[in-house]
């Protein structure tokens, strides 16, 4: 997800997005551990999306 799209969301929407991303990350890690994950780049992509959302939440809390 693009940072520009995330900046337009409210804090509640960002928290919901963070929860969805963390669930997706968990599912991807389980697939990777069991050898079922074919697209390993998704782990890195989701990890960075989580970081983007957490960064924006921190910025909005300070503002």
Curated annotation (Swiss-Prot):
One of its GO terms (cellular component) is cytosolic large ribosomal subunit. Pfam families: Ribosomal_L29. GO terms for biological process: translation. Keywords: Ribonucleoprotein, Ribosomal protein. GO terms for molecular function: structural constituent of ribosome. The keyword Ribonucleoprotein applies. Belongs to the universal ribosomal protein uL29 family. HAMAP family: Ribosomal_uL29. This is Large ribosomal subunit protein uL29. It comes from Klebsiella pneumoniae subsp. pneumoniae (strain ATCC 700721 / MGH 78578). The lineage of its organism: Bacteria, Pseudomonadati, Pseudomonadota, Gammaproteobacteria, Enterobacterales.
């Amino acid at each position: 997800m693009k940072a520009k799209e995330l900046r337009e969301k409210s804090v509640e929407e960002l928290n919901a997005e963070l929860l969805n991303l963390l669930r997706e990350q968990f599912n991807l890690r389980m697939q990777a551990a069991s050898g079922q994950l074919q697209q390993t780049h998704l782990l890195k992509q989701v990890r960075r999306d989580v970081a983007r959302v957490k960064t924006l939440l921190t910025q909005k809390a300070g503002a």
